[in-house]
From Swiss-Prot:
An annotated Gene Ontology molecular function: structural constituent of chitin-based larval cuticle
Described purpose of this protein according to its UniProt entry: Component of the cuticle of the larva.
InterPro entries: CHIT_BIND_RR_consensus, Cuticle_Struct_Prot, Insect_cuticle
Chitin-binding type R&R domain location: 31-92
Organism: Drosophila melanogaster
GO terms under biological process: chitin-based cuticle development; larval chitin-based cuticle development
Organism placement in taxonomy: Eukaryota, Metazoa, Ecdysozoa, Arthropoda, Hexapoda
Gene name as annotated: Lcp9
PANTHER family in alphabetical order: CUTICLE PROTEIN, CUTICULAR PROTEIN 11A-RELATED
Protein name: Larval cuticle protein 9
Length: 92
């Protein structure tokens, strides 16, 4: 469920700017793990990896980055597991 929420948030950011083109897109989905990365022409980028652990718990880590309205780059590095979503926001 947490993965779905994080993915929905990232997709909302992606589709908020319909003028952006996909510059890079990679993904690999397996039964027990996954990873993906994308970069858009408007300087939004994201990377995420995840693995299925015991008792149907996913452990996910990743980061995304975008340019805020004030012109500064914002980067969020996060993990998500059975204890919740743990982001760390860095503004460059």
């Amino acid at each position: 469920m947490k993965f779905v929420i994080v993915l929905a948030c990232l997709l909302a950011v992606v589709f908020a700017n319909e003028e952006a083109d996909v510059v890079k897109s990679d993904s690999e989905v397996n039964l027990l793990d996954f990873n993906y990365a994308y970069e858009l022409s408007n300087h939004i980028r994201a990377v995420q990896t995840g693995a299925l652990k015991e008792h149907d718990n996913w452990v996910v880590s990743g980061e995304y980055e975008y340019v805020a309205p004030n012109g500064k780059t914002v980067k969020v590095v996060y993990t998500a597991d059975e204890t919740g979503y743990h982001p760390k926001v860095v503004e460059a």
